[in-house]
Swiss-Prot record:
Residues 278-288, 427-444 have a biased composition (Pro residues). Belongs to the NUT family. Residues 476-487 have a biased composition (Basic residues). The lineage of its organism: Eukaryota, Metazoa, Chordata, Craniata, Vertebrata. Residues 273-324, 417-512, 527-560, 624-693, 709-757, 775-878 are annotated as: Disordered. It comes from the Eukaryota. This is NUT family member 2B. PANTHER family: NUT FAMILY MEMBER 1, NUT FAMILY MEMBER 2A-RELATED. Residues 537-551 have a biased composition (Basic and acidic residues). Signal peptide: none annotated.
Length: 878
């Protein structure tokens, strides 16, 4: 027979007595070893928990994890009895703090191995074990290996409750590790917090050997009976995630109100034992007791720190020192996930959160063992102080552990998203994962719904069932701290928190609300005005259906011949100058000015006001600014050219006067020189030209909308269309450049061609009265009347033309001659002739120049004979 100690040493026992003596001799060292050295198979928590060296007499905490191995032969029946050390109030600080027991069984040939592990009670993690009594007696049977724990009295009051039943199958060839007592709460306090050991327990172990495969395995029954326990809230011990407020761990008066029946089953698998497999058959009914349901607290029990403290989690568990068990690693991983919020709360901006969470796992467990009444805040404060006093070299083990846990977490997220992606085509919502700590907002579930355009206030609907993109595995390498043990600075592990990737959402384009469209239409109508259709009705009526909208086929393009004719006219320079002659000079000046802020509306209003003015009011309005411009822009050379042109027009005008009989012809002959009595065809042509240009000047300067001046038109004789003096009313008198000798000859040469173009230009000249509403009327009013308002009668009608002629035939005054010389400079030879015609011409021209014919208008008038041709044609027909 062989007994193995915790250090791996073997003790040979040849007989039952020697085995008992070995047990007695090695029991203190087995339960409370003087030292603990973690081997390669132990986990980090085991190393942290076994840093102290307790002694049998004084038991400082934390208590170590112990293991005792013994070889029991089924052929030799013997009974051994050993006592577990139960701490008193002086050693532990809390009465009733006892040890737990873990029995492991294995079958090798005809031998069975029982592995007994002891661990202190009071842990909230998976390593918590109930109380084992001070005495255990094993009585193996002849045909059935039975370990019977003899009952004994317990100091704690309370009703007796039946034994707990744990049934398991022991396969041949592999160890069966069972948890002696489940971690499910058995007895609760009145406030639902904390257990403490209340007495001893009786353990009934019934075993039988399995023969054959696992399916035909013979049942082994382990009946465990224990005294009442007081369960402590796991959330308060393990990080405060479930129960954030600090919970007192003090032991309360034992009130046994619940005795649970737990059946934990495990089944052998390759590489370990799996959880959640079918349970073996239950024990005989005689060994079972109905559960007693608590009347004061029938609600759900709080989740443990690792989320496994439930009936389903009370199946077989590995011994605490078996660190290579995947189940213990998984539970530590869940503990680490729950400790991270606590670490972030104390180190919000530190990258050591993951490593600190790993450090809290053994520290909080040790503190819970040592002082169950310690609050959560006090435990965290002690843990943080211990972390600050830990060197970088000692922290390395926790950084490595955090690195592995980060890899587990990333792999878990990837598996969850992969499962969602696999279930995406079927459009089934993914099952809820048992994540106790939410890491960001959950991904929205993809539901297959028909695509539709939502209303204005309706929610958006997902359009299709799209699989979420496969996330990339984040890099979880932690930067190790520098090997500087003398520095106490915290080493920062650069571990970026993984971000959950959301599946792509297909957005449905929003429909434009009709209210917005109507508002846009109203704004455009307000800016552009209501559009009129071909029938002249507003656009609103057409929208209402009152007026039918014309079809696009009804629209006819303009005549291409007309367009080509307009292009041909615009290509001619003379046509362009003729069109410029009918444009208002002020409008043209404003249009050509470099000022970009030209107000067309104000200009149009000003022109409309001038349209309603009389001739005298118009002269009074425009005379002062024209005088200023005339002084600034007049040039002597231009005056000489105008005088020469006036002399030639004077002779042409006299020839026209002699050609037409008139009662007042004598008066006209007296005012004209005798050299111009003879005439020829050239003179007749000049007479007609002079008359036409005179009429042209009157048309361009006239305001036919004036009612006072229109009244005088029918009373005048037909011959009054011709001026009585060549210098009166001519274009040169108005200081227009069209009367120069060069322009006159050009007009004579182009006379016939222009007469042919007049009918085609009627559509362009039809609106000349609207464009030029401010000039003189188209009546034979002499230019001298512009500055002589006294010649108008009391009724607004003009005096007789003969009186005007007699007034104009008077000799020029010296004042007029004085004004002429500084204005025009030297006189031409034609002006020095003794006849008074040129003098009168200069006088009339001077008065008109001071009146309306400023030099500013000379730059914009180049082709005025356009309208005069029409008047010339009418005169020839007479």
């Amino acid at each position: 027979m062989e007994v193995k100690g915790p250090s791996g040493r073997s003790f040979c026992c040849e007989s039952e007595g020697q085995f008992k003596s070995c047990l007695k001799r090695h029991t203190p060292s087995l339960l409370l070893p003087s030292s603990w050295k973690g081997n390669s198979g132990s986990c980090l928590m085991a190393e942290a928990l076994h840093r102290t060296s307790p002694t049998p007499n004084s038991c400082p905490l934390p208590l170590p994890l112990c293991r005792m191995s013994g070889v029991l032969c089924s052929r030799n029946l013997f009974t051994f009895k050993f006592s577990l050390f139960q701490l008193d109030s002086g050693a532990s600080g809390e009465p009733g703090h006892s040890l737990g027991l873990t029995l492991g069984f294995s079958y090798c040939g005809n031998c069975q191995t029982a592995v007994v592990s002891a661990q202190p009670e009071g842990m909230a993690s998976n390593g918590a074990y109930p109380v084992l009594g001070p005495g255990v007696t094993a009585n193996p049977g002849t045909s059935l290996s039975v370990f019977t724990a003899l009952p004994f009295t317990t100091p704690a009051p309370g009703p007796a409750h039946g034994p707990l039943l744990v049934t398991a199958g022991a396969p041949p060839g592999g160890p069966l590790v069972l948890s002696t007592f489940p971690s499910t709460p058995l007895v609760t306090e009145q406030d639902g917090c904390g257990p403490s050991g209340a007495g001893a327990s009786n353990v009934f172990v019934q075993m039988r050997t399995e023969v054959g495969p696992v399916k035909a395995a013979q049942a082994q029954t382990l009946v465990l009976t224990q005294a009442p326990l007081v369960w402590q809230a796991p959330g308060a011990l393990c990080g405060g995630v479930v129960c954030p407020p600090p919970l007192l761990l003090a032991a309360a008066p034992v009130v046994p109100v619940m005795a649970a029946q737990v059946v934990g089953g495990t089944q052998a698998c390759e590489g370990g034992w799996s959880q959640g497999l079918p349970l073996p058959p239950p024990p005989p009914p005689a060994a079972q007791l109905p559960p007693i349901v608590s009347q004061g607290n029938a609600g759900p029990w709080p989740q443990g720190a690792h989320g496994e403290s439930s009936l389903a989690s009370s199946q077989a568990k590995a011994p605490p020192d078996d660190s290579c068990n995947p189940r213990s690693v998984y539970e530590n991983f869940r503990l680490w996930q729950h400790y991270k919020p606590l670490a972030r709360r104390h180190l919000p901006q530190s990258p050591d959160t993951e490593a600190l969470s790993c450090f809290l796992i053994p520290v909080l467990r040790s503190l819970a063992r040592r002082k169950p009444t310690m609050t959560l805040e006090e435990g965290l404060w002690r843990a943080m102080r211990e972390w600050q006093h830990t060197s970088n070299f000692d922290r390395m083990i926790f950084y490595e552990m955090a690195e592995k846990f980060l890899e587990f977490e990333a792999e878990e997220e990837m598996q969850i998203q992969k499962s969602q992606w696999m279930k995406g085509p079927q459009c089934l919502p993914p099952p809820a994962t048992p994540r106790l700590e939410p890491r960001g907002p959950p991904a929205p579930e993809v539901v297959k719904q028909p695509v539709y355009l939502p209303s204005k206030a309706g929610p958006k609907a997902p359009t299709a069932c799209l699989p979420p993109p496969r996330p990339q595995r984040p890099v979880t390498k932690a930067r190790r701290p520098p090997p500087r043990p003398h520095r106490r600075a915290e080493t920062k592990a650069r571990l970026p928190p993984p971000r959950p990737q959301r599946p792509a959402e297909t957005k449905v384009p929003e429909e434009i609300p009709p209210e917005v469209v109507q508002e846009y239409v109203d704004i455009m109508e307000e800016l552009l005005g209501p559009s009129l259709g071909a029938t002249g009705e507003p656009e609103k009526q057409r929208e209402e259906g009152k007026v039918k909208q014309p079809q696009e086929e009804d629209w006819t393009p303009p005549d291409p011949g007309l367009l080509s004719y307009i292009d041909k006219l615009c290509s001619q320079k003379d046509f362009v100058t003729k069109v410029e002659a009918v444009i208002h000079p002020q409008f043209l000046e404003e249009l050509l000015s470099p000022d970009p802020q030209m107000d067309f509306l104000a200009l149009s209003q000003d022109l409309e006001q001038e349209e309603g003015l009389t001739l005298a009011q118009l002269v009074e309005k425009r005379l002062p600014p024209l005088k200023e411009k005339q002084h600034a822009r007049a040039a002597p050379s231009r005056g000489t050219a105008r005088l020469d042109s006036s002399s030639s027009k004077f002779a042409a005008g006299q020839g026209a006067e002699r050609d037409v009989p008139d009662p007042q012809q004598g008066v006209g002959m007296e005012t004209c020189p005798p050299q111009m009595t003879a005439r020829d065809s050239q003179g007749r042509g000049r007479a007609h030209t002079g008359m036409a240009r005179s009429e042209d000047s009157v048309v361009l300067l006239g305001c036919q909308d004036s009612p006072g001046l229109r009244a005088a038109w029918p009373t005048s004789p037909p011959q009054d269309h011709r001026p009585t003096c060549p210098g009166v009313g001519t274009k040169d008198a108005l200081d227009l450049p069209g009367g120069s000798p060069v322009r006159e000859s050009h007009g004579l040469a182009q006379g016939s061609s222009e007469e042919e173009e007049l009918p085609s230009l009627a559509f362009l000249l039809g609106s000349q009265h609207k464009l030029l509403p401010w000039w003189l009327p188209q009546s034979p009013v002499p230019a001298s009347g512009l500055l002589s308002p006294e010649k108008w009668g009391p009724q607004g009608t003009h005096q007789s033309p003969s009186a005007e002629r007699r007034g104009l035939n008077l000799a020029p005054s010296p004042a007029n001659k004085a004004k002429k010389r500084p204005l025009f400079g030297s006189l031409s030879p034609a002006e020095k002739t003794p006849y008074p015609g040129p003098g009168l011409r200069v006088s009339g021209e001077q008065s008109l120049t001071w009146g309306l014919g400023g030099p500013s208008q000379s730059q914009k008038r180049k082709g005025d004979p356009l309208v005069s041709r029409k008047e010339k044609k009418q005169h020839c027909s007479q």
